[in-house]
Amino acid sequence: MKTNVLPAENSAQNTKATNAVLGKDVMEAVWADMALTELPSWVSDVPPNWGTPARGKLSANNWRVICTVHLPITLIRLWGGDDTPKPWRDFLENFMDLVCAAQIANLRSISKEEIKLYEHYIFRYVTNFKSLYKHSKVKPIHHAALHYGDILRGFGPAHTHGGAFYERYIYSMQSMNHNMKFGM
């Protein structure tokens, strides 16, 4: 049975005022779907109360699982129907462009064709972001994401040059003795 959770008619004005797309009803639908979703053993569980003040901050891996697994499951169910009003269908398509780009950017191996596909999705995401979220500003991370195809072309898959690599490098540098002082 399809449940179509869309904001009330006057919520469009509230959405612009609060900069929020996911309201309480949508969040409750996500949490309900999470309780019914069986994840493979290699996918980390996320806190069931994410998105609430009581929960606090989430790890990058929590956000990855939420945005690439849980939100797509619920948002496609809620906003993916032919009868979904245009703005909400557009929000879904824009979010799915971001999900596709993120999935491609995090592949363990990557081809030239996949890099072009990444560039297609991220360009469409940023372009449509500007028209869908007129009240929001394009951030430096959006600009950086548009250049990430060049980074993938030059340095290969993200895991070879991602944060974990630099964390290990920084740790090894801090472990060395520099001028008789630790951590310099």
Question: In which residue ranges do the predicted regions lie?
Answer:
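A structural signal for the principal folded core domain
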Residues: 1-184
